A protein has these predicted regions:
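NAD(P)+-binding Rossmann beta1-loop-alpha1 motif at the extreme N-terminus of oxidoreductases
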Residues: 16-79
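Rossmann-like NAD(P)-binding element
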Residues: 74-104, 108-109
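Glycine-rich, N-terminal phosphate-binding loop of Rossmann-like dinucleotide-binding domains
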Residues: 87-89, 114, 165
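Rossmann-like NAD(P)(H) cofactor-binding subdomain of soluble oxidoreductases
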Residues: 96-149
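Internal alpha-helical scaffold of NAD(P)-dependent oxidoreductase catalytic cores
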Residues: 154-238
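Interdomain hinge/lid region at the active-site interface
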Residues: 224-291
Length: 302
């Protein structure tokens, strides 16, 4: 890839950044739609091409100012792309990559946005050939909402994006993917795929399970109780409104790491239970304080 360069002054000083000749986003939902919006808003790509499976979605996307063209097939969409971002659900990323590989330019770079990385990074690297490259990525910028209509150009601003090369990944390709996400506003962390999956099992996948489990439990109680819910319950369970099919697939793909995290969390719950049962409120307070101290060290909300 031979990107042009541009001067980026959005943070008050000049930095050199890559401008892609063509960015293609396959299967844009919330994240993919935000990638296209951010790329247009920040001048990251001269041309932005999208492909969606449904014809009516392609028609709607073609009307957006941040989309230059849509194609009827993913193969057509990637044919002239410098960078391809596959924004499909995690179980469809590698099959879609294998489908388009024969049409990739020799120097094309393919990435993804999947929230599970070990299997995708390994199989993705094995799938590409002919000079093209695959580098996994995962922006930590989701929402309980789904669909490209909910995308935002500023979705990645200040958010972490994991870039997950494997040992055989081309170093320049990995650097290009990291630069791409920085140009979209993200703070890039380069990490191996297995460590990524362990981390997100604890900080993303486990919270989803807990929010859903709490709502599922409350659904067995008096239905009228939900009418009295205050901010605490609403804040705690916001992500329980997330797409069921999407999360079933994520939990399936990261099953082993999520199970480990669940077992460890169960130990914490049992500690609270034992302290309450034994009327050991000093221990209860200590556990509450440990949780409060951890929460207070979060980065400021963006």
């Amino acid at each position: 890839m031979q990107p042009h360069e541009r001067l980026d002054r959005r943070v008050g000083f000049c930095v050199l950044a890559a401008v892609l000749e063509q960015l293609t986003v396959l299967a844009p939902g919330l994240i993919g739609g935000s990638v296209a919006r951010a790329a247009r808003a920040r001048g990251v790509a001269r041309r932005i091409v999208l492909w969606a499976r449904r014809p009516e979605t392609r028609l709607a996307l073609a009307e957006q100012a941040w989309c230059d063209a849509t194609e009827e097939t993913p193969e057509e969409a990637v044919a002239e792309a410098s960078m391809v971002v596959i924004a499909a659900p995690v179980d469809l990323i590698v099959p879609l990559l294998r489908q388009v590989v024969p049409r990739l330019k020799p120097d094309a770079i393919v990435s993804d946005v999947g929230s599970v990385k070990a299997e995708i990074s390994r199989l993705g690297r094995e799938a590409v050939r002919g000079g093209a490259h695959f580098v996994g990525a995962h922006p930590m910028a989701g929402s309980e909402k789904t669909g490209w209509q909910h995308g935002k150009a500023e979705l990645f601003d200040g958010r972490t994006c994991f870039v997950t090369p494997v040992d055989s990944t081309d170093a320049e390709a990995a650097a290009s993917v990291a630069r791409f996400w920085r140009d979209l506003g993200a703070e890039v962390v380069t990490i191996d795929p297995d460590t990524h999956d362990e981390i997100v099992a604890h900080i993303s996948h486990l919270p989803q399970l807990l929010a859903s489990a709490l709502c599922a439990f409350l659904a067995t109680r008096d239905p009228s109780w939900r009418n009295y819910a205050g901010g605490g319950l609403r804040d705690t369970t916001r992500i329980a409104a997330s797409d069921t099919k999407l999360w079933r697939t994520i939990l399936q793909e990261n099953r082993d790491e999520v199970l480990r995290a669940l077992r460890q969390f169960q130990d914490e719950l049992e500690g609270f239970q034992a302290a309450l049962a034994n009327r050991d409120f000093i221990e209860v307070a200590a556990r509450l304080e440990r949780g409060r101290a951890y929460r207070d060290k979060f980065r400021p909300s963006l």
